[in-house]
Amino acid sequence: MERVLIVNADDFGLSKGQNYGIVEAYRNGVVTSTTALVNGEAIDHAAQLSRELPALGVGMHFVLTLGKPVSEMPGLTRDGLLGKWIWQMAEEDTLPLDEIAHELACQYQRFIDVFGREPTHLDSHHHVHMFPQIFPIVAHFAAQRGIALRIDRQTVLNADDLPSDLRSTQGFSSEFYGEEITEACFLRILDASAHRGEASLEVMCHPAFVDNIIRQSAYCYPRLTELEVLTSASLKAAIAERGYRPGSFLDI
């Protein structure tokens, strides 16, 4: 059985170092897709690079935890900025869902304005779209527009509640992260997916060159390690040996 493998690099537009790392991992490695933060400091730079790479799938990385929102969000921001207090608000069930739905639409339009096309798919920074209160908003938004959505099926409370016309991969992994950034880890993810009989798999990654913006991230130097592993010739060969076909969310 032919299996589609999407290696998606998150955080396109976060910084020039992040952008260059993603492009390097695409041109000389196994990355096939990326998702962009439309409020990132280097989003225009990301769009410029993407025009030179028409085969690179570019989706939207919905942001509710970093930087300034595209719309006014008085119920979620502090001093005009987004932040990680969203987790506490989710636990307290005080999320401003109307604001979030409006911000999603505004970020989507901002993506189209910057990139000149619709995103191939949607996911989110820090997986906030998987919050139980937010997921239905994003899932129906994606289904209405006919674009794919990253779904961690182990997190979805009830798969029967998913829109019938929502597109996604059968498998998703965020395990290629932190201390587990090795070729062996990457291949274990593929083998586990194949064992489950999944015809499509997305592996999340964050390859980057370190710059001043990336240095401010709690997840900094491991991005360099990711880049090294993702551009290794042996990994590309091992993926091919396992019968995976590189693809993007347009193949789902």
Swiss-Prot record:
Pathway: Glycan degradation; chitin degradation. Its cofactor is Mg(2+). It is found in: Cytoplasm. It is an enzyme of class 3 (hydrolase). Disulfide bonds: none annotated. Mg(2+) binds at H61, H125. The keyword Hydrolase applies. GO terms for molecular function: chitin disaccharide deacetylase activity; deacetylase activity; metal ion binding. It catalyses: N,N'-diacetylchitobiose + H2O = N-acetyl-beta-D-glucosaminyl-(1->4)-D-glucosamine + acetate; diacetylchitobiose-6'-phosphate + H2O = N'-monoacetylchitobiose-6'-phosphate + acetate. The keyword Ubl conjugation does not apply. GO terms for cellular component: cytoplasm. Keywords: Carbohydrate metabolism, Chitin degradation, Cytoplasm, Hydrolase, Magnesium, Metal-binding, Polysaccharide degradation. InterPro entries: COD_ChbG_bac, Glyco_hydro/deAcase_b/a-brl, YdjC-like. Pfam families: YdjC (PF04794). GO terms for biological process: chitin catabolic process; diacetylchitobiose catabolic process; polysaccharide catabolic process. Its EC number is 3.5.1.105. Homodimer. Belongs to the YdjC deacetylase family. ChbG subfamily. Involved in the degradation of chitin. ChbG is essential for growth on the acetylated chitooligosaccharides chitobiose and chitotriose but is dispensable for growth on cellobiose and chitosan dimer, the deacetylated form of chitobiose. Deacetylation of chitobiose-6-P and chitotriose-6-P is necessary for both the activation of the chb promoter by the regulatory protein ChbR and the hydrolysis of phosphorylated beta-glucosides by the phospho-beta-glucosidase ChbF. NCBIfam families: PRK02134.1 (NF002559). This is Chitooligosaccharide deacetylase.
